Amino acid sequence: MMTNGAKTLYDKVFEAHIVHQDESGSCLLYIDRHLVHEVTSPQAFEGLKTAGRPVRRTDCTLATVDHNIPTESRRHFRNTESFIKEADSRLQVQTLEQNVKDFHVPYLGMSDERQGIVHIIGPEQGFTLPGTTVVCGDSHTSTHGAFGALAFGIGTSEVEHVLATQTVIQSKSKNMRIHVEGSLSPGITSKDLILHIIGVIGTAGGTGCVIEFTGQAIQELTMEARMSMCNMAIEAGARAGMIQPDETTFEYLKGRPLAPTGAEWEKAVTYWKTLKTDEDAVFDISVTVKGADIRPTITWGTSPQDALPIDAAVPDPANVSDPIKRSGMEAALEYMGLEPNTLLKDIKIDKVFIGSCTNARIEDLRAAAAVVDGHRIAPTVKRAMVVPGSGLVKKQAEAEGLDKIFEAAGFEWREAGCSMCLGMNPDILGPKERCASTSNRNFEGRQGRLSRTHLMSPAMAAAAGIMGHFVDIREFEFKESSAPKVEVRHDTDSSTLEEANYGHAKEEPPSAELSDVAKQEKVNDIPVSNSSTQSPGSAPSADAGLQPFLQLQGIAAPLDKANVDTDAIIPKQFLKTIKRTGLKEGLFYDWRFAKHADGKVTGTDFVLNREPYRKATTLVVTGPNFGCGSSREHAPWALKDFGIMCIIAPSFGDIFYNNSFKNGLLPIRLPQDVIKEKLYPIASAGGELVIDLPAQQIADGEGHILVTQFDVEPSRKHCLVNGLDDIGLTLQKERFIADYEAMRRRDFSFLEGGSKLLPRISHSKPTSMPQAANDW
């Protein structure tokens, strides 16, 4: 798949990592950096244990905990057993602790000052480098593309594949460029810019593509701002987002713990300077936006594409002609509790969340602190939280006095973790609570059942907390105070970070009391399972192989929706498992079941709750972008558990599409008009469809051919038809992998060592964790 002539940045990085390419064009890519966390790794490590396989490159692997850990004070942290109260969360963390011990994987646990959100600690430590391939079982791995890395999220099956082979099977994506002309206006951030872009192209605008962000405004961004941009490329449907590395990149990386040094640094920079798109390279898709047009931007609905400038009003569905879009808008407004034509600045909020892998770096905290300095949160705001992205960010912020400014303003100052971004931990919203959030997704139920999330920049979220409603940051009154002066700096000097003490000056105040409703939500949002009776490492293994997919005949269920995200397919509370099975109940849980005020849960009239669709084997979806959102492989696991083995839609989220094949499911892309005219009527009538994979045809229950030829990549078809194990097939190419590694040691020696270079820190917090868990 070598590109002749002019190449894009993506072309260059992709081609530099090809280990082997088959006749169909499918490539085996070498992975330079693999980040691991507690939610998407248990089943992967169990697969290794079952097969007796080691982790091939522990030096290219770095693990941490972030998704479901509490963010309350760790001043008296002793161990995971006593600190994490929720049994299923505790089990996942303990399972990771055992796995990193068993497989000798470098690990930054809760007792380590360097622990934090996985996409913050990678760059922070210099583990992320330009021109590398970076993967993680998390969709926001695209964050690392800010360094000119090819970084993308993978599912659990691919996590296992990378652990075992240090490679991943990939097909080349299309090239997309988003060019930002001119500079951003004062007060406008990269969060405003990326929300505006997603609002323009939609959440499916980048499907099948790797986006390169270019232009003057991009070049002028700090590294932390660039990371926020690439972080949300996935919300535009892209496989990854990339920015050309430059002097800003090199300055950020130089001197970080895992970055090259000496002659290796010079060798690396010489190579990194070649990582730029050639002038005459051709992009498949190009979009241009003007930097001067960007205003402070927030979301109003239940998708990141529902983004508008702060001086706009809530849209009116009556002005939309497309019936699917109009219906989706009406549903979003009902869920969000908003009336059409309401000014965004008139919308009142209940809570504020400043954090997440999008906006929890030191630059973000400085910007928010500058806003709240000298103010107090509005009396109508129930809770305002600031959650640093890592222990080191927290240290640096405390050294600058930011924690005191936040606390004086009424904000809670928390420990590092994903926190309220996805509500897998105790930090959640109560039903119908409205939050000004710096996170990356505003899906239904993302921050708690019936939660209402509005995305925005840290400064905008902080200002909303002070005023009690959304405000235009350009009109906000900044105050001087007697608190330590906050300088909103634009550098990323790590000297303070290196010198700061980890210990707190005093015991942190307890968290604000949750309302009765929120307490109830905290308990009841997590389905009861028997996982708490298991011990770490006892997860059932993956199937030894997949059942061959030849012909599938059965009931087809209709679903007339667009942008069905993975949070809707399987809500976050069902991710707290170390198994691949038992997820049938969680499939479309919030659509299939209703929770009443008395706590009772009853079934709805959702299609899969009705006959004959309770036994559906195929799902026929009319709208595009099915499976958009997170990398959770739990989505295809839940579909498979229910009995659905084929999904037909106009388009799919890239990660979901890939995860489906890994689990023996067949996702079929067809034109929307073909689905609506030929397949949807049969599904609506409770009829059957026959999916013939060898022939690549679709027929009705009586054998009449409806689709004479659907497309499926030859390599994927071969694996499905034969029920083949990807890892076993890849290990047959050991010679090619070994040859690539020999070349890598010679030509890219600055990548060697990786996480094995991570030093132990003598002043990390004491812990009763077994020494071997941190023994690198």
UniProtKB/Swiss-Prot annotation:
Compositional bias of kind Basic and acidic residues: 482-493
Origin superkingdom: Eukaryota
Pathway where this protein functions: Amino-acid biosynthesis; L-leucine biosynthesis; L-leucine from 3-methyl-2-oxobutanoate: step 2/4
Subunit structure of this chain's protein: Monomer.
Record field: compositional bias (Polar residues): 527-538
Cofactor: record remark: Binds 1 [4Fe-4S] cluster per subunit.
One Gene Ontology term of the molecular function aspect: metal ion binding
Keyword Amino-acid biosynthesis: yes
EC number of this enzyme: 4.2.1.33
Keyword rRNA processing found: no
Catalytic activity: (2R,3S)-3-isopropylmalate = (2S)-2-isopropylmalate
Keywords for this protein: 4Fe-4S, Amino-acid biosynthesis, Branched-chain amino acid biosynthesis, Iron, Iron-sulfur, Leucine biosynthesis, Lyase, Metal-binding
Free-text function comment from the UniProt entry: Catalyzes the isomerization between 2-isopropylmalate and 3-isopropylmalate, via the formation of 2-isopropylmaleate.
Residues that, per the record, bind [4Fe-4S] cluster: C357, C418, C421
Top EC class of this enzyme: lyase
Gene Ontology CC terms: 3-isopropylmalate dehydratase complex
InterPro entries, per database record: 3-IsopropMal_deHydase_lsu, 3-IsopropMal_deHydase_ssu, 3-IsopropMal_deHydtase_ssu/lsu, Acnase/IPM_dHydase_lsu_aba_1/3, Acoase/IPM_deHydtase_lsu_aba, Aconitase/3IPM_dehydase_swvl, Aconitase_4Fe-4S_BS, Aconitase_4Fe-4S_dom
Protein name per UniProt: 3-isopropylmalate dehydratase
Cofactor section: [4Fe-4S] cluster
PANTHER family: 3-ISOPROPYLMALATE DEHYDRATASE, HOMOACONITASE, MITOCHONDRIAL-RELATED
GO biological process, one term: L-leucine biosynthetic process
Family named by the database record: Belongs to the aconitase/IPM isomerase family.
Segments of this protein annotated with the region Disordered: 482-518, 525-544
Transmembrane segments: none
